[in-house]
Amino acid sequence: MAEDGQRTGPGVVAVVALAGAVLLFLIAPVVIIVIVSFSGADYLSFPPPFLSLRWYQRFLGTPSWRQSIVVSAQVALLTMVFATVLGLLASLALVRGRFRGKGAIYAVLLSPMIVPTIITAIGLYFFFVRLKATGSILAMALGHTVLALPVVIIIMAATLQGFDIRLEQAALSLGASRVTALRRITLPLILPGVLSAALFAFLTSFDELLIPLFLSGVEVQTLTVRIWNSLVLEVDPTIAAVSSFLIGVTTVVLGASAFLRGRGESATGT
């Protein structure tokens, strides 16, 4: 036993070291951006010569940046509503339904996760150009829904599969209609999973660049498009502050989603 431990010891150390190196490689850019965002210098520098909030003040004090936050929030909220409703209906059909071609339909619904986003963006651009709808919040929200829907379906399908169907069957046996059982039994119990999926849809939209890059207009720009345009024209530490803001939003949303998923698993007993 001791010899086995000695033989496996170096392997375990190597795996842990490799995992730590990968984790550091992934986290280091984020940490650097956050630190640079507090720099008081007039240019991007790491480590910063001294700390200051001046770039956050410029970010939040510039009307164009604030407008981009509002546009991103509006698009993300619409995307969240569209993707959540469509994803819930699709998940119910895929999990509960018995019909031919269910696997093919499921594959088609998840295809936006496989197809390169640039191809999806180009297709959406030509579609909305024909409708003369580019540059609108609705067009960007519909485009983001295409990307968010697969994520929502995966989360909701997993939630429904973990739901004890006997609870709904008991309600039906007591005279409740399917709609009533769904509304008063199923939905309250899977609500944490639904909210978690909705948050992921919001985050998918809020962080997306390529689709709004094709569909946004001169006056209607999301925060990510505004960052891109600023990087093309000029680079100053304001970009680091904006990026840190996005990192903060992502962290909060992911934390809330993880909390809701934990509550959902407790409620469904999975």
Provide a role label for each language-model segment.
Residues L18, L23-V30, V146, I153-I165, ...:
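Transmembrane alpha-helices
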Residues A2-A17, G101, A157-E168, L172, ...:
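C-terminal transmembrane helix and the adjacent membrane-cytosol boundary/short C-terminal tail
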Residues A28-P63, L213-V218, T270:
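Short membrane-interfacial helix/loop motifs at transmembrane-helix boundaries
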Residues D4, L44, P48, L53, ...:
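Membrane-interfacial helix termini and adjacent extracytoplasmic/periplasmic loops
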Residues G5-V12, A41, Y56-Q67, F206-A256, ...:
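Interhelical loop and adjacent transmembrane-helix boundary motif
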Residues R66, V70, Q74-L86, A90, ...:
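Hydrophobic alpha-helical transmembrane segments of multipass integral membrane proteins
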Residues A2-T8, L77-L109, F126-V129, I165, ...:
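Transmembrane-helix boundary motif in ABC transporter permease subunits
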Residues Q67-Q74, F126-V151, I155, L191-G193, ...:
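Loop-to-helix entry region at the N-terminal start of transmembrane alpha-helices
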